[in-house]
Amino acid sequence: MGHTSGPVDPVFGQCQVFDCSAAEVNPEVVKYLAHVRDEALHTVGVVPSASNLRKRKIEISYDDEEVVKRPSEGEKAIELPFDMDEVISWFDQVKEDALSEREAFEGYDEETLNTLLVGIRDYISRMSSRDESTNNLIKLLEGVQPVVTNEALELDEKWAAKLVARLGRRKFTTLDNLKLRLNTQLPIPTRAKAWKIHIPINEPSHEFFHRMNSTQLFDLLRYLTDNIVEHYQTDSATDYGQWLVYLLLHLPRQLTANEISEVRGLSKKVRALIIDHEILKLPMLLPSEIEDVSPIPRGVNPLHLALAVVAVIYGQRDILFL
């Protein structure tokens, strides 16, 4: 078996080292190498280009029969409501920004903090009904005045609602205690029960995910795998969609076989949800830090996006079939 410098493998990006076509090559060796290649394609996060999944209302083209087995008769391709190449290109762009280095949150300056406090007070005053915790908050905030009027620092209504819900879980005795809480980094949940509380009342952020290690990322992945189907059928569906997208943005591209298996497990739960057409009507609402990088392509929702990413980025193309 002599050395060769054959063409570059379109999947693995490497040249063939040995010429396996020679007559003297042991057929068992060829069979073994083919088996190794097949195992690699099915267990490692091979990254095929998005164009290999060409779509006309997602028709999947298999250019290389060895990459993945063809769907069996009766299996139906999932129709994605967007152009695959465009969406994966958008995802790559947003992911590059998400993974870029950024400063850790170290608290607000005086101007921003006071504007935030006034915004909280104004939001609570507009609430149609208040409980004991929100009444306590508005009482603490009665005398707060902004340092300057800055329309650019006005609170987003949805973000304000989550913030007030989070603050309402604690009893603050002084304004200084409230300020201290606002200037403190959000802790990373360590248990499923904590994630259940955390997700509906906190928007995800790149700063938050940058503080998570690999173990914590996969703890969140397992929590979503176990709970996303249940919570996507509640008022928290949009919240779970946001956290799903952020998880995908911050997962490494290179994963072990076991990690790929866990990603597949989550994508199967996501796939089970897309049967419900009402769920698919939910819009994909993401924080401004993503929209500011690149507007969300038309027709994208978190569930279909997750399937597209797992299929293309992690090489699990069969996930696009029911």
From Swiss-Prot:
Listed transmembrane segments: none
Keyword Translocase: no
Keyword Nucleus: yes
GO BP, sorted A to Z: spliceosomal snRNP assembly
InterPro entries in the record: Brr1, Gemin2/Brr1
Keywords (A to Z) from UniProt: mRNA processing, mRNA splicing, Nucleus, Spliceosome
GO cellular component, one term: small nuclear ribonucleoprotein complex
Localization (cell): Nucleus
Coiled coil: none
Family per similarity comment: Belongs to the BRR1 family.
Function: Involved in mRNA splicing. Required for snRNA accumulation and manufacture of snRNPs.
Protein's recorded name: Pre-mRNA-splicing factor BRR1
Organism from which the protein derives: Eremothecium gossypii (strain ATCC 10895 / CBS 109.51 / FGSC 9923 / NRRL Y-1056) (Yeast)
Taxonomy of the source species: Eukaryota, Fungi, Dikarya, Ascomycota, Saccharomycotina
Designated gene of the protein: BRR1
